[in-house]
Amino acid sequence: MKLGQRNSVCILSSRERGAPGLASYRVLQQLVEEKTQRMKWQSQKVELPDSPRSTFLLAFSPDRSLMASTHVNHNIYITEVKSGKCVHSLVGHRRTPWCLTFHPIIPGLIASGCLDGEVRIWDLHGGSESWLTESNSAIASLAFHPTAQLLLIATNNEVHLWDWSRKEPFTVVKTASETERVRLVRFDPLGHYLLTAIVNPSNQPNDDDPEIPMDSVEMPHLRQRSFLQSQPARRTPILHNFLHILTSRNSVPQAGGAHSASTDGSSDSSGPYTLMCVQPLGMVCFCSRCSAARVPSPPDEDPSDSASLEAQAHTFSSARTEPLQMSRFSVESRAANRSSAFSSVYGGGSNMRNHSSSSGRRGVTGMAPVPHFRQHPPGREGGGRHPGADWTVSGLNGQSSSMTPQRTGASSVSLLSVLRQQETSFQSPVYTSASDRWGSTPGTSSSRHRPPEEEGQSSSSSIHSVLRCNLYRYFMDYEGTQDTVQPLDGSRQDQQTQEMLNNNMDPEQPGPSHYQSPYSGENPPHSHMNRCRVCHNLFTYNQGSRRWDRTGQPSSTERNTPWQPSSSAFHSVAPVSQSNEHLLEHRPIESTPNTPEPHVPFSQRTDTGQHEEQAVGLVFNQETGQLERVYRQSASSRSANISQGALNQEMPEDTPDNDYLRRLSPAAYYAQRMIQYLSRRDSVRQHSHRPPSRPRPLSSNPSSLSPSPVPNAESSEVDFEEFEENGSRYRTPRNARMSAPSLGRFVGTRRFLLPEFLPYAGIFHERGQPGLATHSSVNRVLAGAVIGDGQSAVASNIANTTYRLQWWDFTKFDLPEISNASVNVLVPNCKIYNDASCDISADGQLLAVFIPSSQRGFPDEGILAVYSLAPHNLGEMLYSKRFGPNAISVSLSPMGRYVMVGLASRRILLHQISDHMVAQVFRLQQPHAGETSMRRVFDVVYPMAPDQRRHVSINSARWLPDPGLGLAYGTNKGDLVICRPVDVHSDGSSTSEHSERMFTINNGGGVGPSSSRSGDRAGSSRTDRRSRRDIGLMNGVGLQPQPPAASVTSQGTQTQNQRLQHAETQTDRDLPDDPQQPSTSQGSQVTDATESLDFETLPEDSGSEVVPETPPHSRPQEDEGSDPSEPSTDSTGQAEYVSRIRRLMAEGGMTAVVQREQSTTMASMGSFGNNIIVSHRIHRGSQTGADAQNRTRLSPIPGPSSGAPESLAAASYSRVLTNTLGFRGDTAQGIDLTEQERLHTSFFTPEFSPLFSSAVDATGPSSSIGADSVLEGEDFHDFASLPPSLLSSSPSLSPVNNSNYSNSDSSYLGDEYGR
């Protein structure tokens, strides 16, 4: 048999012959899975002991016969899948088990972890092993390795590896900080790869700040987007603080013996940090040993920046999570350039983990002490390499240049370089699992934190870590390469290098090295402005001056700091970045390297380094069409020639508070800008009486400044005025006039952000997204409301916390380097609540997970994304579907062709309902098709009685492990439900009949289903549609379909044994005022109530009758040409009839009338949707024949002729029919059966049935489309083929409109007598 045969008969036949085709078994499984999705599903609740209040996770045994479930009563129940019976109870946890897993190979072995930090491995045949974490922290996830005796335990920011034959785990790996909690660990089915989910550090410090993806496509626009960063105190905490941490590393001292000092003032506030030493990480350590050797924070250190860093690092030793976040975004774009997407390589710039759980250190081996780099001579080798490539082993100084030994031990980690050789040319450090240091001797391990020259100095002992290379890689991977320039001689080379690092606006800027030069003892800290230049060319808006402060981030040729040499060659060699050369007009200013400068608080957005001038803002020069910088210089050297025309221009005023303006219409944008301008002008006028203030001298050596000439120089001084706003003091050039905003600014302000990152105009704007701060605040409120309602899973989806999924190669049992957030990132942002929030297919080729949507809302939408785990397209999103925040569980079918999404109750979003959809099943049909890549197949509905009103949420939903077996789910009410497919043709019924909900009997009796009459006419196409309507209407009248009763033959009339349902059971609605309101009852079901009426159940003194209508085949000939729009001659009888019916009801005479839509007058009877009055009872004694005739005369049959003959005929036919059925009562006499049969075939009423458009021939087949044809989309040609005798003899087959009750029927929709 050829490959790809999908015919099950051929496959089975070939298997019988002993020649099965390739993958034939899998094809059969796929066919089974496809077939079962179209079957009816039946739910079975598992009877659990103790009736737990909630069911959390589900797991299946490797032999697929057992299912384990965790519950809120701290127990674990084992259930047989086939029988649905609970067979085991595992008791022993002190708190709720949060994670659960079976061993994929060993039968009867199950592991569970609870919220108090206890891990238990249960043997269902008896016995268990347990281990308790030291801090009693909750166990987040567990994973058995398929082939090794190894259990992975995720708790807090650690992953423990436990061989349960030992008392405790033998090793542990940790993330870079305590806030990077590990939420999920999962092996692929073969155990070759390990999946980890770790909290993204960017979510922890400040949820209000945006997370800027560093994608290769977006990198050229990154600098433009930096225009839109937030206020001075909170701008870009991720990359900003990361670069600040980088600049806090000190290099070896200069040739003059100068010592290094702390470079980051924010890292000097070591008060709140009492954690262990993290010097091996290359971070600023706050332990007691390192703090004693650090210079205290200077008295004028700005507390705002320290507080901002402290706010981001209050739970860990230093803000080292930012570099991980920064590097994480670029890994996907770099992956395509590597030899393989994810090999067993790890970034050399990552933090390593502690291999020993008993270590007294912080638990993260992290970066072992990286030695300082020696100075390179002017003509250093490798001049063609990129800047920063010198931090290699070959660049180590003499005291720490020894190479590290190769790894030792079975559990050691093999590290390969992830940087391309032409980019970095460095060797990856190799770690051993036997110690927390590199392969060097213990004696040099600690001394390498500081060179001998720095041992006695009160300076920072920070080292140049591999993270510095990550910064270099970050720029170089996207900006390309250039040849480096020849470095200068002496210490100016180091100074120039430091300035180039700080001014790293242009990644192509060449430089001799990447290590940081030390500072002088008189001026220990560099300014924040100087450090912020590496913050991807940020332009920060100053609220006070209403201008964009460039934050001292000059380009390669702009003003040079004391480290900048005076050589003119340097200015001409370094080019300007292509993305910025149209923005700035650079003004190089030379200065001497020994000029001290007082420290200025960072909140003033001034340069507090050793610069001789400060950047006040940027102005737009209309003459040159460029942005020009405005500097503040020292008082004694104000010779900088600043363009007066530039000062008179206005900069864009896109503050974070006004982010919503970008999506407004130009008119609204201009109006908002005008309001801001007027408010700002009034604020300036309030301070206009203040005397002009001169800036303080910035340097004690003002003669060192020699500004470069600038065109349009009209003044040698710049006057500044100080003012206060929002509690802060600001300075602005006095001659920089304010101008009213113009509409022309609107176009210019929109170019700095990509559309997907543009915030909305506001909540109520149809085009925009909410501001980041507003969006985060509202989501926090919603999450708090939801979690207060007990839906922590939904709150987790609403919250701003995201997780990164990393895919680790475990074929060689290499420990995952989870401390490095930039390597092996499979999904950078996703939502994880528990183990049910992520699933790997049985074949290990697909990964399903929820990711946040780019479109913000209240709350955010989520996206179900299915990624590929195949080697050729690893990490590629194949399928996606949008969901609300209540999608909390996902499971891939055994064959990987369907996905089930478990839903929590949306009680805060939707009204309460009795029918709860708890899950949806989708078919994966077309990759890369967006929303159409998945097609919904069916919904999983929780079985609940209509009188029960409670919210039901899914905690976990899983497919049963074998194809076609079904699915199972656990709810927040403690239910464990197994759904199995049932063949819809097993009982001879159709799919649509089974898809309808069966209704509960509200009374003592029931009737047979009208679908049983489908056998009266072979090939009837209305059976399915009619039965759906029957069930709906019978539920309204309190009836339920039951098996059909035996039919009887009486006087040649074939009909079923009929019963009369007491009318009192059908009166549960009020009478509406509008007589023309159409009925919502699906009338064909009332037919069943009529055709099975039991007249013998009525009391003897009661008079009841069935008044049928004649079929359309006996309609009078003259009615054939009647106009439907022509008013009836008896239209006046309509109102009279309605009033008569209401009067009878008011007097208690009439108790029930069952009807259908406005267009029809009678409830449907029979399999053809015939329209017949069911019954009504008169309580005031027996009904005489005259009364019956009188009642029929009250509403004459509408039509061109008089209604009296038709009324008599109808009454006469009632007599014959009731006599046939054995009805006890008197009826009208005088018309024989033949005449009755002829008159029985009446006509449709155009006046009272506006849906009817044509008449019906009384002698031949019908050519018109009746009410049922309009409602059901079918003609009556099938009905016309029947002889009139059959129609007249069987009222259940009469599709006629009874005009006697035409009006009354339409007037009783929804009343107590209808339905």
UniProtKB/Swiss-Prot annotation:
Coiled-coil portions: none
Intervals holding WD repeats: 50-89, 92-132, 134-174
InterPro entries in the cross-refs: AMBRA1_autophagy (IPR052596), WD40/YVTN_repeat-like_dom_sf (IPR015943), WD40_repeat_CS (IPR019775), WD40_repeat_dom_sf (IPR036322), WD40_rpt (IPR001680)
Ranges annotated as biased composition (Polar residues): 351-360, 394-409, 426-435, 552-581, 633-647, 1047-1060, 1076-1090, 1125-1134, 1181-1193
Location of the protein in the cell: Endoplasmic reticulum; Cytoplasm, Cytoskeleton; Cytoplasmic vesicle, Autophagosome; Mitochondrion
A single GO cellular-component term on record: autophagosome
Composition-biased stretches (Low complexity): 696-715, 1009-1021, 1286-1307
GO MF entries: protein phosphatase activator activity; ubiquitin-like ligase-substrate adaptor activity
Functional pathway: Protein modification; protein ubiquitination
Main location: endoplasmic reticulum
Effects seen without this gene: Morpholino knockdown of ambra1a causes impaired dorso-ventral patterning in embryos. Morpholino knockdown of ambra1a and ambra1b results in reduced autophagy and increased apoptosis during embryogenesis. Morpholino knockdown of ambra1a and ambra1b results in impaired locomotion, caused by abnormal myogenesis.
Subunit text: Component of the DCX(AMBRA1) E3 ubiquitin ligase complex.
Function summary: Substrate-recognition component of a DCX (DDB1-CUL4-X-box) E3 ubiquitin-protein ligase complex involved in cell cycle control and autophagy. The DCX(AMBRA1) complex specifically mediates the polyubiquitination of target proteins. Acts as an upstream master regulator of the transition from G1 to S cell phase: ambra1a specifically recognizes and binds phosphorylated cyclin-D (ccnd1, ccnd2 and ccnd3), leading to cyclin-D ubiquitination by the DCX(AMBRA1) complex and subsequent degradation.
UniProt name for this protein: Activating molecule in BECN1-regulated autophagy protein 1A
